[in-house]
């Protein structure tokens, strides 16, 4: 076997043994600090004080109990797909984003209307 073919086979074997690439683990977030950042940076104008969503400048998604993984959440803050302002690393650190993520994960989320007594009388 030629030297080039041996190197190629070795590289392929190394890649196979390395396993699949995984997303970097999210920094551990602090929900209490996340609430402070969420309120201080005005996230609530569009997303509501408890992440319930809203329509301040067009429809804003519900953030409470979001099923979006951290990397997607961070990506949306860094390079938003909609009319949301972008938050560069100079404006908001990855740790602050992790804190906001922890905060919105701590919110109760939507309740089933059938579980609200006043709506069912």
What role is predicted for each listed range?
Residues 1-9:
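Bacterial N-terminal signal peptides that target proteins for export
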Residues 2, 28-32:
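Juxtamembrane/transmembrane-helix boundary motifs in multi-pass membrane proteins
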Residues 8-16:
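Bacterial N-terminal signal peptides
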Residues 19-23:
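Sec/Tat signal peptide C-region and signal peptidase I cleavage site
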Residues 24-29, 40-41, 49, 86-121:
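Flexible coil segments in periplasmic/lumen-exposed cytochrome c-class electron-transfer proteins
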Residues 31, 35, 39, 48-86:
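Gly/Gly-Pro-rich "capping" loops immediately C-terminal to redox-active cysteine motifs
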Residues 45:
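Short, cysteine/histidine-rich loop/knuckle motifs that typically chelate Zn2+
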């Amino acid at each position: 076997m030629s030297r080039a073919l041996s190197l190629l086979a070795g590289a392929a074997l190394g890649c196979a043994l390395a396993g699949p690439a995984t997303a970097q683990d999210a920094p551990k977030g602090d929900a209490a600090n996340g609430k402070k950042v969420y309120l201080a940076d005005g996230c609530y104008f569009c997303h509501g004080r408890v992440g319930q969503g809203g329509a301040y400048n067009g429809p804003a998604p519900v953030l409470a109990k979001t099923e979006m993984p951290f990397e997607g959440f961070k990506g949306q803050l860094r390079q938003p797909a909609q009319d949301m302002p972008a938050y560069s690393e100079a404006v908001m650190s990855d740790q602050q984003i992790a804190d906001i993520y922890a905060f919105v994960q701590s919110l109760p989320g939507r309740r089933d209307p059938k579980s609200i007594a006043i709506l069912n009388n």
